[in-house]
Amino acid sequence: MGARADDYLSAHGYRPGSIQLIQKAYEEADNVDDFAAKLSDEGVVIAEGRYIYTLIRGD
């Protein structure tokens, strides 16, 4: 997913299973809103989901 995303997820205690879920959500998402909604369904705050999306994209 990239060094910035990996560092963020590690620093915030995301475990391998959660990281796999995030990767899958990113691969399946059409845009940032879709991605954030998918993560929200798993309990991630929308704003954090949007931020993670930008980290993965490298924005």
What are these regions (language model features)?
Residues 1-59:
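Single-stranded nucleic-acid nicking/binding segments centered on His-rich, glycine/basic loops
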